[in-house]
Curated annotation (Swiss-Prot):
Biased amino acid composition, Basic residues: 331-341
Transmembrane segments: none
SMART domains linked to this entry: Tryp_SPc
Record gene name: ACR
Name of the protein in its database record: Acrosin
GO MF assignments: amidase activity; D-mannose binding; fucose binding; serine-type endopeptidase activity; serine-type peptidase activity
The Peptidase S1 domain, residue ranges: 40-288
InterPro entries hit by this protein: Pept_S1A_acrosin (IPR012267), Peptidase_S1_PA (IPR009003), Peptidase_S1_PA_chymotrypsin (IPR043504), Peptidase_S1A (IPR001314), Trypsin_dom (IPR001254), TRYPSIN_HIS (IPR018114), TRYPSIN_SER (IPR033116)
Residue ranges listed under propeptide: 351-431
Organism: Oryctolagus cuniculus (Rabbit)
């Protein structure tokens, strides 16, 4: 019989092997917050294990081995993290990044290794969307490959993606955002504590109206927050999840990735998120379709909006403003975090050109040519009647006397006429 210690080691090894694949249920909170978070900006601290798929993406400085929180991310499985593409606008080298899993508290600028149950990992590969537009933040989505694979456990677990047939999320869902970003717009550095906030999904037509974002939002975005502001994501929350569920007890589904906004918690300037459902095929093409087996069942209600079109025309400036938090102050400090007071307004929409006039109708076919006139009646071919013998004899006598004759209006020489006349038979006078 094996000693108890050996059996315990075997059991732990089997559990660790199963957890290392992160094949368990997705979207489940290991510890619910009984108070329910209401804010990130000025908000409520999340308890450890409340959002086990949350990842802190940290800039690493080799000269002093320090790490600085910059963006959030979502754990999909033991090998991949989903985040925002704009986090890597200025930091694309894999050795510049570290990932911390299972954290509730983080220390900005620390050089200390993490302690269990937290896990620190390297970035093996950065995969940004091939049509990401840093000017408009279109297709603001990216994937990070984890090395070595991270094991799931009590405070680390995968997030759910929506079903490919579910379409856009319904507005009636309960949604949360979470992150270590700024707790107010002009904060000097990110929050050391994971914050959470409950937000409402806002209709895209309202969010795109003139007094709000004035046409900047595309069909591949989600708009979440409150019309009056006050509760919002902020700098340092980029790449983190917008998580929703329809009913109590159901798993949370990552419906969006924190992308951009104007300021933080401003009225009529809610947070803008990259919707995940339009990019499921792209994610599967990069990490394998098997990695999406944890997607929630399809929503019975058919989608209410069409799939996204492609891109907004580029503007003169980036739209800001949940860019990642300012990095280490030396040697390459990031710009001051205070955003521009308003996003660049896109040029006024021009009226569509009038449709070209219809082509003129084809001309009517020419009338058929008139029928040819009937041919004149053929000239009579009746031979002239022969002159009587007495008449011919009289004409001969006149010729012999030197006379001439006329036929109609045409003058005829009598000598030639006599030569052309019908030969007169010889007359013999009886003696």
């Amino acid at each position: 019989m094996l000693p108890t210690a050996v059996l315990l080691v075997l059991v732990v090894s089997v559990v660790a092997k199963d957890n290392a694949t992160c094949d368990g249920p997705c979207g489940l909170r290991f510890r619910q917050n009984p108070q329910g978070g209401f804010r990130v900006v000025g908000g409520q601290a999340a308890q450890q294990g409340a959002w086990p798929w949350m990842v802190s993406l940290q800039i690493f400085t080799p000269r002093n081995n320090r790490r600085y929180h910059a963006c959030g991310g979502v754990l999909l499985n033991a090998h991949w993290v989903l985040t925002a593409a704009h986090c890597f606008n200025n930091k694309q080298k894999v050795y510049e990044w570290r990932m911390v899993f299972g954290a509730q508290e983080i220390e900005y600028g620390t050089d200390k290794p993490v302690r269990p149950p937290l896990q620190e990992r390297y970035v093996e590969k950065v995969v940004t969307h091939d049509q990401y537009n840093y000017m408009t933040e279109g297709n603001d989505i990216a994937l990070l490959k984890i090395t070595p694979p991270v094991p799931c456990g009590p405070f680390i677990g995968p997030g759910c993606l929506p079903n490919s047939k579910a379409g856009p999320p319904k507005a009636a869902q309960t949604c949360y955002v979470a992150g270590w970003g700024y707790v107010k717009e002009n904060a000097p550095r990110p929050s050391p504590t994971l914050m959470e906030a409950r937000v409402d999904l806002i209709n895209l037509e309202l969010c795109n109206s003139t007094q709000w974002y004035n046409g900047r939002i595309t069909a591949s975005n989600l708009c979440a927050g409150y019309p009056s502001g006050k509760i919002d994501t902020c700098q340092g929350d980029s790449g983190g999840p917008l998580m929703c569920r329809e009913n109590q007890g159901e798993p949370f589904v990552v419906q969006g990735i924190t992308s951009w906004g104007v300021g933080c918690a401003r009225a009529k300037r809610p947070g803008i998120y990259t919707a995940t459902w339009p990019f499921l095929d792209w994610i599967a093409s990069r990490i394998g379709s098997n990695a999406l087996r944890m997607i929630q069942p399809a929503t019975p209600t058919p989608p209410t909006t069409r799939s996204p079109g492609v891109h907004q025309p580029p503007s003169a400036h980036p739209p800001w403003y949940f860019q990642h938090a300012s990095g280490p102050p030396h040697p390459h400090p990031h710009p001051h975090p205070h955003p521009h007071p308003r996003p660049p307004q896109p040029p006024a929409a021009q009226a569509p050109p009038p449709p070209p006039p219809p082509p003129p109708p084809p001309p009517p076919p020419p009338p058929p040519p008139p029928p040819p006139p009937p041919p004149p009646p053929p000239a009579s071919t009746k031979p002239p009647q022969a002159l009587s013998f007495a008449k011919r004899l009289q004409q001969l006598v006149e010729v012999l006397k030197g006379g001439s004759t006329f036929s109609g209006a045409k003058r005829v020489d009598t000598a030639a006429a006599a030569a052309e006349a019908t030969e007169i038979p010889e007359v013999t006078l009886a003696s």
